[in-house]
Structures are given as structure tokens and as C-alpha cells.
């Protein structure tokens, strides 16, 4: 029984219906044409790969902000946070992480703290690699207060192909760094907004690993010690 539970654990539940559908179509195609059946099996295997949900070794410290997603650090700039969160016209550092269709799409909590507000904003579906995607695309914005009292924002953004954002958080949730909280299907972007004086530990073009890569350290001016936990 444990083996079956472990199997389902490594696949995100959002993928179950897709995998089952692909497998059924593959079976039907194979009954008519062997080559079509092979193509269907390849598509099913890719679907399983897309919805993979691997464990990560998460650095644990109240000072740290970790990447909420796998992908490329596409942009780091000063920008206003999503207006729907009511933070006013105070610019923050925005770290944008672009996910292609081959990245793990499960999203993770970037820091220890409490969820203060959530807001879903329906929008367009521009290519998530474009700067305007942060403003105009469909998004799910989350405001949290870290254990150190810092307010940070993380935003799931739909892309050209991604048409489904899943966020399992609720206002008032106490959350831990690296916990899984949602997924964006089929290519997307995640933005993280941090206070302007935050010490960043990533650079543009760097590959980020969700739940592992340290984006920033609020205690950078002092020696920060932390441990790792598998999640």
C-alpha cells in the first residue's frame, strides 16, 4: 500500500484526470493502429512527467526567501506590486521566474509566515516571458508577512499556454517555507516581490529550483545558519 501512496505522491493531483485521459485515448488508438498507440503512450508519458511532484531539500531559516517555482530568473527590477493587494504606490524588488513546459510546475511557499491576503485577477494570456504579463495576464496574488515581520508578495501568472491556476491557500494560513501550495498548468511565470533593501542572492539568467534556491536573505548583514529539510 505504501508503494501506491508514494506513486500518487510524486504526481500532483491536478494531473490525474489528464494522465487517465491520455492513457485511455492511447489504449483506444492502439486498438486501431499500433503507431498511433505508440504516439499516445509517448504523450501519456510526457503528461506524467509534466505533473511530477518531487521532494526538495528546503533550507529552513526565518531569514530566507526561497524560490516558489522551478525556472529561469528572467528579470529582476523595481516595480509596483499588484494593486489588488492594497500595498499602495511603494515599489518593491520584483524577481520574475519563467517556467517552460519542461519545468516542474508545482509551486511552493517562499518563506515562513502568515498569509494576509489573496486575490484572483482574471486577465489575458500573453506569453509569460513578456514584461506585460505581470500586469495584464490572469494571476493569483498572495500577500504574506514573514516570521521576521517583512511583507512579501508572490504571484502565479498564467501564460500563453497555461490556462489554469491552482492555489490552495486561504487568508490566515500559517505557512512554512517549501510547502506546496499550488500549480500552474502548461507553461507560466511566478513573480516574487520583496522590500527594496532586501539582499538578493540570485541574478538574471540563473536557473532556480523551487523549494531549494535561496532568492534572498533578510539577515544577510549577519551570519545566517540554517538547516535543510526534505519536503
From Swiss-Prot:
Pfam families, alphabetized: PS_Dcarbxylase (PF02666)
What is the enzyme's main class? Answer: lyase
Q: How is it modified after translation?
A: Is synthesized initially as an inactive proenzyme. Formation of the active enzyme involves a self-maturation process in which the active site pyruvoyl group is generated from an internal serine residue via an autocatalytic post-translational modification. Two non-identical subunits are generated from the proenzyme in this reaction, and the pyruvate is formed at the N-terminus of the alpha chain, which is derived from the carboxyl end of the proenzyme.
Pyruvic acid (Ser) modification sites?
A: 188
- GO terms assigned for molecular function: phosphatidylserine decarboxylase activity
**EC number of this enzyme:** 4.1.1.65
Provide the active-site residues from the annotation. 188 (schiff-base intermediate with substrate)
- UniProt GO BP: phosphatidylethanolamine biosynthetic process
Q: What does the record's cofactor remark say about binding? A: Binds 1 pyruvoyl group covalently per subunit.
Q: Does the keyword Lipid biosynthesis apply?
A: yes
The answer to keyword Membrane applying to this record is yes
Q: Which cofactor does it need?
A: pyruvate
Residues the record marks as site: Cleavage (non-hydrolytic): 187-188
Q: Name one GO cellular component term.
A: plasma membrane
Q: Tell me the subunit arrangement.
A: Heterodimer of a large membrane-associated beta subunit and a small pyruvoyl-containing alpha subunit.
Q: State the family it belongs to.
A: Belongs to the phosphatidylserine decarboxylase family. PSD-A subfamily.
Q: Which HAMAP family match?
A: PS_decarb_PSD_A (MF_00664)
Protein name per UniProt = Phosphatidylserine decarboxylase proenzyme
Give the species: Rickettsia africae (strain ESF-5)
Gene field: psd
Amino acid at each position: 500500500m505504501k508503494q501506491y501512496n508514494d506513486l500518487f505522491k510524486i504526481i500532483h493531483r491536478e494531473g490525474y484526470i489528464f494522465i487517465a485521459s491520455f492513457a485511455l485515448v492511447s489504449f483506444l488508438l492502439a486498438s486501431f493502429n499500433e503507431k498511433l498507440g505508440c504516439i499516445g503512450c509517448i504523450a501519456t508519458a510526457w503528461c506524467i512527467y509534466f505533473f511530477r511532484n518531487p521532494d526538495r531539500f528546503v533550507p529552513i531559516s526565518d531569514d530566507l526567501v526561497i524560490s516558489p517555482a522551478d525556472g529561469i530568473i528572467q528579470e529582476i527590477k523595481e516595480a509596483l506590486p499588484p494593486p489588488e493587494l492594497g500595498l499602495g504606490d511603494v515599489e518593491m524588488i520584483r524577481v520574475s521566474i519563467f517556467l517552460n513546459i519542461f519545468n516542474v510546475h508545482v509551486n511552493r511557499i517562499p518563506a515562513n509566515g502568515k498569509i494576509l491576503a489573496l486575490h484572483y485577477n482574471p486577465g489575458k494570456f500573453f506569453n509569460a516571458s513578456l514584461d506585460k504579463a505581470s500586469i495584464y495576464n490572469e494571476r493569483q496574488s498572495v500577500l504574506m508577512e514573514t516570521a521576521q515581520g517583512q511583507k512579501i508578495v508572490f504571484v502565479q501568472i498564467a501564460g500563453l499556454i497555461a490556462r489554469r491556476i491552482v492555489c490552495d491557500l486561504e487568508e490566515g494560513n500559517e505557512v512554512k517555507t517549501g510547502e506546496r501550495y499550488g500549480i500552474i498548468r502548461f507553461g507560466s511565470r511566478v513573480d516574487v516581490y520583496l522590500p527594496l533593501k532586501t539582499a538578493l542572492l540570485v541574478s538574471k539568467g540563473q536557473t532556480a529550483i523551487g523549494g531549494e534556491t535561496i532568492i534572498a536573505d533578510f539577515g544577510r548583514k549577519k551570519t545566517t545558519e540554517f538547516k535543510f529539510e526534505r519536503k
